[in-house]
Amino acid sequence: RLFTATIQRCLGKEQIADLMEYQAEITKDSFIKTFWNGYYLDDYVDGDYHNAEVRPNQIIAASLPYSPLDRRQCKAVVDICTKELYTPKGLRTISPKSGGYRPEYIGGQLERDRNFHNGPVWPWTIAAYAIAYLKVYQHSGESFIRRLLTGYEAEMSELCIGTLNELYDGNPPFKGHGGMSYAPSVASVIEVCNTLA
């Protein structure tokens, strides 16, 4: 059930809870009709144009406790993100199969700005990925998620001592860039650890 409907039911407000559940179902249906392309979620929709580039935004929808996606759709999203976006440092911002893939965060400000959302890895995506992965694969996915955390060990003990960068190149050796001690990156790894605890 929708979180707010659950709260309303706890407060004894059944009519409000029913209305919220009804509205949530309409929203879910609209979300699926708009973004689900039969295989995974489109990145964005503009009128009749559906951008089907594989990007990590869709993992957030799959990770939500009250996701608009059913179990089969969540699995499809997790699987496409694993196949095309997953790296030892997190999820790439776009699939290497995309024509706009720019894995390195290098060059002048203009080039770095252009590349920022088109190939580098954002570690902050790893918490949503781990939560969605465990939602789909449950206990059988725990060993994979534990191994996922080892991708940060060298970074935290040798390079960015005790912390993580804002982003990493999308291809090996996954060199770190951007802000050091980037709070969303660190918080995401901590959230994964807490999820496994």
Language model segments and positions:
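Hydrophobic alpha-helical segments
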Residues: 132, 136-139, 151-162, 167, ...
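Alpha-helical support elements that line or immediately flank enzyme active sites
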Residues: 57-69, 78, 130-139, 145, ...
